[in-house]
Amino acid sequence: GAGVVVLMSASMAIEMGVPVYGVVAMSGTATDKEGRSVPAPGKGVLTSARERASGGSPHLQVLDVEYRRRQLRKRQTQIDEWAREERALLSTDSTQTSESLEFINTEAARQHRDALDSWGTEFWKQNPHISPLRGSLSVWNLTVDDIGVASFHGTSTKANDPNESRILNLQLSHLNRTRGNVIPAVCQKHLTGHPKGPASMWMLNGVLQTLRSGVIPGNKNADNIDQELKECEHVVFPSRALRTPGVKAGLLKSFGFGQVGAECLVVHADCLLGVLSEQQLSEYRGKLEKRERRAYRYWHNTLTGVHPFVQVKTSPPYASSSSESTYLDPHFRLPKMY
């Protein structure tokens, strides 16, 4: 089998008015060594918590979103000032002025994008004091204490369960998660079994449902937790569902065969929608409602035989006679369908 998830940038999702179920704040894979045991899990995913354990990492100034916002505004002001100075130096030659003005505007836009990356999603990169996990959380003004659920690979094997629990516990300890703020572990393979292709897709869907509902499902078969797992002070294995005021972020783990592991940090969609202005949010909601109505009609037309579910296109969205000029035109864009 297989599972499909539609991923796109936040700006594109807002512009198109598509439903946002969650934000992929971080993802990664890791292989730690050569292993002869097929089912033995590796520990390479520990690298997402790699940072110098100085005890002061959570207090770094750059982790403060207000500090980063101030630096971003300062950089944006510098870019705008540079663009104004360059425009003032343009000659009166209309041809040269037009081309130079286009370059200045394009370069200013590029610098603005770089500034957003530098002080936004990528501020923590190449900093040995900030781990990928901590940095990715801080992008959304969250900390390691805000991770409210962990979706385990959870194969219930003698090798996987203790190893996976210890790895998560070690990550949280290294990142100074507050003691007593335990993270519920969800091992949904007790219900779904172990699929092949869509395993992580099902787990991701479960995390998204937890983020949207605030309900952390229990592990129905967890009626006798192994004493060995008690050493993991940051992890708890609930046997019944927990209704919470809300879960801000969830951590999904996948431990594959041959020491291959993967990890994905998913943040609540409200963290994205919360940064929009009132006008932007209103426009997004309008587009979303329109898209939902169209999707509803399309689906029912499929069920009633009006048209097939997949309508395969047999011709390009441009005239065949102009294909060469289209390929060579960097400004060519298809008409918006939303």
Where are the predicted features?
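Short glycine-aspartate micro-motif
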Residues: 21, 149, 219, 250-252
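Condensing-enzyme catalytic core mediating Claisen C-C bond formation in acyl metabolism
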Residues: 1-136, 140, 149, 267-328, ...
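Solvent-exposed alpha-helices and their adjacent loops that cap or buttress functional pockets
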Residues: 14-16, 143, 177, 239-246, ...
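Conserved small-residue
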Residues: 6, 24, 147, 152-153, ...
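Conserved catalytic cysteine-centered active-site region
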Residues: 1, 15, 106-109, 167-202
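A short beta-alpha structural unit
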Residues: 117-122, 148-158, 187-195
